[in-house]
Amino acid sequence: MDETGNLTVSSATCHDTIDDFRNQVYSTLYSMISVVGFFGNGFVLYVLIKTYHKKSAFQVYMINLAVADLLCVCTLPLRVVYYVHKGIWLFGDFLCRLSTYALYVNLYCSIFFMTAMSFFRCIAIVFPVQNINLVTQKKARFVCVGIWIFVILTSSPFLMAKPQKDEKNNTKCFEPPQDNQTKNHVLVLHYVSLFVGFIIPFVIIIVCYTMIILTLLKKSMKKNLSSHKKAIGMIMVVTAAFLVSFMPYHIQRTIHLHFLHNETKPCDSVLRMQKSVVITLSLAASNCCFDPLLYFFSGGNFRKRLSTFRKHSLSSVTYVPRKKASLPEKGEEICKV
């Protein structure tokens, strides 16, 4: 949970903190993720919308992934300002809760969208006959709406969390729970999200990718080479996202929440735990940067869309008005198809 972002040193004998490390790492990495995520996903979303006449189920998932990423990266600058000001929140209680909420909506929407894409790509390759009826744009929209509703509702406790204040009555954001009752509630939420939001999807993609790889090995690589490349690209990017962004974060969060329940916390253990939180939470936020790679390497159609978009853009730049009786430009014809 994002409230585990900063662990307060509770040992009376420990006066060291990682505040400087935390503020520098978070402000630097969140700034980089904001820029890369905003321009990467913004560009992909712009191209997909401009070429929306070329509809596909894969495109529906890509659009939803890009929207989820953009909603998250738009709140990351608030975190950057917070850590630049050394842990003083300047934007009010609601934006504090919204910033936490947006990160987790993005995190689990990304996991579920990637899982859905992997499942339907598996159906398309392993069961090509059933693929005709199962992998459709309409079903993809239905799945995406279901994912949004589920994640938005299950993440709602972050919007209802009580604000925290320091001794100077400044609003504190992204802090760990202090009272035992809140710690227990957070622990329950953690295990629900761990199993439903990470372990089950991870098992699904492992099964799907195993079936895809076995099927591709049986088939001649010369046949459907484009489809094979897209499948391999998706396997590489999604696996990297799970291993780099999602898995370290969920493992560390489990350890951290149980660590909070310990009455005695050695100083060196507290400092190591704090640093591990900073690193893994930053890696979790970096999933926004993986998704543009997924669009490019696993979506052959996306590269065709990009080519169409570039041709249309060039034709718009070089377009010279003609008489009404003249034929339309080639770029205009492509855009209207």
From Swiss-Prot:
<dbReference type="InterPro" id="IPR017452">
    <property type="entry name" value="GPCR_Rhodpsn_7TM"/>
</dbReference>
<dbReference type="InterPro" id="IPR004071">
    <property type="entry name" value="Cyst_leuk_rcpt"/>
</dbReference>
<feature type="topological domain" description="Cytoplasmic">
    <location>
        <begin position="128"/>
        <end position="141"/>
    </location>
</feature>
<dbReference type="GO" id="GO:0007204">
    <property type="term" value="P:positive regulation of cytosolic calcium ion concentration"/>
</dbReference>
<keyword id="KW-1015">Disulfide bond</keyword>
<comment type="similarity">
    <text>Belongs to the G-protein coupled receptor 1 family.</text>
</comment>
<protein>
    <recommendedName>
        <fullName>Cysteinyl leukotriene receptor 1</fullName>
    </recommendedName>
</protein>
<keyword id="KW-1133">Transmembrane helix</keyword>
<feature type="glycosylation site" description="N-linked (GlcNAc...) asparagine">
    <location>
        <position position="169"/>
    </location>
</feature>
<comment type="function">
    <text>Receptor for cysteinyl leukotrienes mediating bronchoconstriction of individuals with and without asthma. Stimulation by LTD4 results in the contraction and proliferation of smooth muscle, edema, eosinophil migration and damage to the mucus layer in the lung. This response is mediated via a G-protein that activates a phosphatidylinositol-calcium second messenger system. The rank order of affinities for the leukotrienes is LTD4 &gt;&gt; LTE4 = LTC4 &gt;&gt; LTB4.</text>
</comment>
<dbReference type="GO" id="GO:0008528">
    <property type="term" value="F:G protein-coupled peptide receptor activity"/>
</dbReference>
<feature type="topological domain" description="Extracellular">
    <location>
        <begin position="1"/>
        <end position="28"/>
    </location>
</feature>
<feature type="transmembrane region" description="Helical; Name=3">
    <location>
        <begin position="107"/>
        <end position="127"/>
    </location>
</feature>
<feature type="topological domain" description="Cytoplasmic">
    <location>
        <begin position="50"/>
        <end position="57"/>
    </location>
</feature>
<feature type="disulfide bond">
    <location>
        <begin position="96"/>
        <end position="173"/>
    </location>
</feature>
<feature type="topological domain" description="Cytoplasmic">
    <location>
        <begin position="298"/>
        <end position="337"/>
    </location>
</feature>
<feature type="transmembrane region" description="Helical; Name=6">
    <location>
        <begin position="231"/>
        <end position="251"/>
    </location>
</feature>
<feature type="transmembrane region" description="Helical; Name=5">
    <location>
        <begin position="194"/>
        <end position="214"/>
    </location>
</feature>
<dbReference type="GO" id="GO:0006816">
    <property type="term" value="P:calcium ion transport"/>
</dbReference>
<dbReference type="GO" id="GO:0004974">
    <property type="term" value="F:leukotriene receptor activity"/>
</dbReference>
<feature type="topological domain" description="Extracellular">
    <location>
        <begin position="252"/>
        <end position="276"/>
    </location>
</feature>
<feature type="glycosylation site" description="N-linked (GlcNAc...) asparagine">
    <location>
        <position position="262"/>
    </location>
</feature>
<feature type="glycosylation site" description="N-linked (GlcNAc...) asparagine">
    <location>
        <position position="180"/>
    </location>
</feature>
<feature type="topological domain" description="Cytoplasmic">
    <location>
        <begin position="215"/>
        <end position="230"/>
    </location>
</feature>
<dbReference type="Pfam" id="PF00001">
    <property type="entry name" value="7tm_1"/>
</dbReference>
<feature type="transmembrane region" description="Helical; Name=2">
    <location>
        <begin position="58"/>
        <end position="78"/>
    </location>
</feature>
<dbReference type="InterPro" id="IPR000276">
    <property type="entry name" value="GPCR_Rhodpsn"/>
</dbReference>
<dbReference type="GO" id="GO:0002437">
    <property type="term" value="P:inflammatory response to antigenic stimulus"/>
</dbReference>
<dbReference type="GO" id="GO:0006952">
    <property type="term" value="P:defense response"/>
</dbReference>
<keyword id="KW-0807">Transducer</keyword>
<dbReference type="GO" id="GO:0016020">
    <property type="term" value="C:membrane"/>
</dbReference>
<keyword id="KW-0325">Glycoprotein</keyword>
<feature type="topological domain" description="Extracellular">
    <location>
        <begin position="79"/>
        <end position="106"/>
    </location>
</feature>
<keyword id="KW-0472">Membrane</keyword>
<dbReference type="GO" id="GO:0005886">
    <property type="term" value="C:plasma membrane"/>
</dbReference>
<dbReference type="GO" id="GO:0006935">
    <property type="term" value="P:chemotaxis"/>
</dbReference>
<keyword id="KW-0812">Transmembrane</keyword>
<feature type="transmembrane region" description="Helical; Name=4">
    <location>
        <begin position="142"/>
        <end position="162"/>
    </location>
</feature>
<feature type="topological domain" description="Extracellular">
    <location>
        <begin position="163"/>
        <end position="193"/>
    </location>
</feature>
<dbReference type="InterPro" id="IPR013310">
    <property type="entry name" value="CLT1_recept"/>
</dbReference>
<dbReference type="GO" id="GO:0007218">
    <property type="term" value="P:neuropeptide signaling pathway"/>
</dbReference>
<dbReference type="GO" id="GO:0001631">
    <property type="term" value="F:cysteinyl leukotriene receptor activity"/>
</dbReference>
